[in-house]
Amino acid sequence: TSPEKPSGVALITTVDGGENSIVVNSGANFDLTEADIEKAREAFKSASIVLMQLETPISALIAAANLAKGCGCYVVLNPAPAPKNPLPQELLRNVDLLIPNETEASTISGCKITDEATAAQAIEIIQKTGVKDVIITIGSKGAIAMIDGKPTLSPALRVRAIDTTAAGDTFCGALCTALINGLDMRSALAFANKASSISVTKAGAQISMPYLSEM
């Protein structure tokens, strides 16, 4: 919370076919401090996975990743929105899994992604920064990851997209849920792709995320 600013707000517009544009007023979200992270130490101690994104200050993310690793957590970073500057090594060294989309992965790696081959190339470049695992989401095609040293495409379900607003968030949340419950990466990818595919068939963000019973 912030004594001076309201919570962050996002205005989302969609067009036919489900693609969207998002305008964000970060508000209090960008007032998150390292001290705030430290106050949450007990929550980190009880967690198995910590999932982060780039809508809060980098300094707070670095503090969160450091604390998470110190507490034995698996650290996942969804680098959204696409970073304007290179992500600092002091953040990446504590990230176990990075989940960018095509645009974000292209920005981070410097490799323009046009197909599975260039996606695999981008993954290899990003892994050289110290990140152990990378999954690149590629929209309606699904997601690609290195599994057993080989680029592996996990396809999305074929659906009629109404609103893609929460697709990435749904994918990341579902993937973490699957990993917490002991699924291997290949199975976790399939679970996350299914959840994400279901989410785009409904309008809205949080309301479009499927319950486990829908899976």
Question: Where are the model-predicted features located?
Answer:
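Conserved N-terminal subdomain of the carbohydrate kinase-like
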Residues: 1-48, 215
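Beta-strand->loop->alpha-helix junctions that form or flank phosphate-binding loops
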Residues: 1-7, 78-80, 125, 135-138
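Short, acidic/turn-prone active-site loops that include or flank metal/cofactor-
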Residues: 3, 27-29, 80-82, 103-105, ...
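Structural motif
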Residues: 9-10, 19-22, 48-49, 73-75, ...
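Residues that scaffold the ATP/ADP-binding catalytic core of kinase and kinase-like folds
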Residues: 23, 107-110, 199
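Structured loop/turn residues at beta-strand edges in well-structured enzyme cores
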Residues: 42-45, 93, 129
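Conserved beta-alpha-beta core of the PfkB/ribokinase-like small-molecule kinase fold
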Residues: 49-121, 140-143
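Conserved phosphate-binding/catalytic region of the ribokinase-like
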Residues: 84-85, 89, 116-215
